[in-house]
Amino acid sequence: MTITKEKIAAMLSSKLGFSNNLCEEIVHTVFSNILEIAKEQKLTLKNFGSFEVKQKNPRPGINFHTKAPVIIESKKNLRFVPSSKLKALINGSTR
């Protein structure tokens, strides 16, 4: 299931009674701050999980069309590790 920030804001608005515009601004601000923090360092959201940017080193590879060796450049990957409470919630156990 894919959910948009607008849908999250609409759910907040109906649940809390705030205006939809205010809730959209809150959701946008929260996600923007999470992204900014996660770019710089490991970010852990208690009872949810951790986001961390990992640097992948360059490595040798093969061009599938020409079979020639190539170097795959380094890149950054975002890694998410769910918390044990989130895993338990998904798997149906209550802890």
From Swiss-Prot:
InterPro entries xref list: Hist_DNA-bd, IHF-like_DNA-bd_dom_sf
Transmembrane segments: none
Keyword DNA-binding: yes
Gene3D superfamilies associated with the record: IHF-like DNA-binding proteins
Gene Ontology cellular component list: cytosol
Pfam families: Bac_DNA_binding
The family this protein is said to belong to: Belongs to the bacterial histone-like protein family.
Name of the protein in its database record: Histone-like DNA-binding protein
